[in-house]
């Protein structure tokens, strides 16, 4: 068997970083799910898309019922507000609350600390190139991003 190629490395990377904690994994897992809901609503809003339950489901790759529960939990936690869509009053859409923006600010700070820790010892140039390579892959895949 030959050494793994770059495609295999890419998919190992994706598998590793797409792991989700088990549903019953307690408070840290629930916090992560609430951040995921807030991130999805934020990304949709940045792109000018309505953050409906169906749009959130598509954004994070889960079914509609799972997205509905996720959005409801984030709203109950105070991170999202749910209201009628401006485009279609029959639809409900989510928006970030001030608590949701604070949650995202804290999550983004944590993400930067994790990146700093994982790339410790790398030159600033290597870090920027890696960031650009990840961004390029997202754009080439056709995946939406904020």
Model-assigned labels for residue ranges:
Residues 1, 128-146:
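C-terminal regulatory/oligomerization modules of transcriptional regulators
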Residues 1-35, 39:
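N-terminal leader segment of winged-helix/HTH proteins
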């Amino acid at each position: 068997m030959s050494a793994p190629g770059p495609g295999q490395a890419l998919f190992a990377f994706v598998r590793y970083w797409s792991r989700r904690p088990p549903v019953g994994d307690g408070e840290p897992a629930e916090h992560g799910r609430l951040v995921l809901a807030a991130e999805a609503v934020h990304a949709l809003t940045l792109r000018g898309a309505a953050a409906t339950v169906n749009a959130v489901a598509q954004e994070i790759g889960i079914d509609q019922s799972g997205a509905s529960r996720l959005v409801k939990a984030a709203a109950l936690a105070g991170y999202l507000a749910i209201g009628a869509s401006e485009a279609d009053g029959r639809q409900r859409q989510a928006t970030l609350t001030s608590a949701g923006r604070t949650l995202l600010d804290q999550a983004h700070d944590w993400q930067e600390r994790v990146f700093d820790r994982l790339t410790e010892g790398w030159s600033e140039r290597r870090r920027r190139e890696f960031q650009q390579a990840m961004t390029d892959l997202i754009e080439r895949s056709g995946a939406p991003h904020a």
